[in-house]
């Protein structure tokens, strides 16, 4: 008789298990990828095809957004180290899996409603529309990264601490954090344009 040998679980940063994470928002669950990977680095394999961003690990999407600012452009190892340190801080403060905190933050920071401009007879009229789930995830990750940048750039606060605080506040739905405040602002503008 042969014994079944199970493959060892691949943990993110050799520490965090993604199999125990649940996404509470069913609308974005399809677009938040939680496949296990030791180092979140796909080497650009998913960039050439449309909508394959949904197959990218959500942690790598956050890392890529952190690299978009002027000072961090192309510094992926630095961004990976920032996220790894921020996850440690999140775990120390909340005693939860930081990947689950990230998923809750993405669910709370993504706007559900936005406005588009329609042109009627030469006049631009704002119109409220529902946001697509993939755009909600993209916008949420971008707002989290922008909040981290605004909290830490040219300030004494380390980037990892700013990211940890932003993730915890966004996961709790705190309106004082940048990403949730921007989401509320967009939804308020969309509500007035109905």
Swiss-Prot record:
InterPro entries: Ribosomal_uS7, Ribosomal_uS7_arc, Ribosomal_uS7_CS, Ribosomal_uS7_dom, Ribosomal_uS7_dom_sf, Ribosomal_uS7_euk/arc. It comes from the Archaea. GO terms for molecular function: rRNA binding; structural constituent of ribosome. Pfam families: Ribosomal_S7. GO terms for biological process: translation. One of its GO terms (cellular component) is small ribosomal subunit. Keywords: Ribonucleoprotein, Ribosomal protein, RNA-binding, rRNA-binding. One of the primary rRNA binding proteins, it binds directly to 16S rRNA where it nucleates assembly of the head domain of the 30S subunit. Is located at the subunit interface close to the decoding center. Belongs to the universal ribosomal protein uS7 family. Part of the 30S ribosomal subunit. This is Small ribosomal subunit protein uS7.
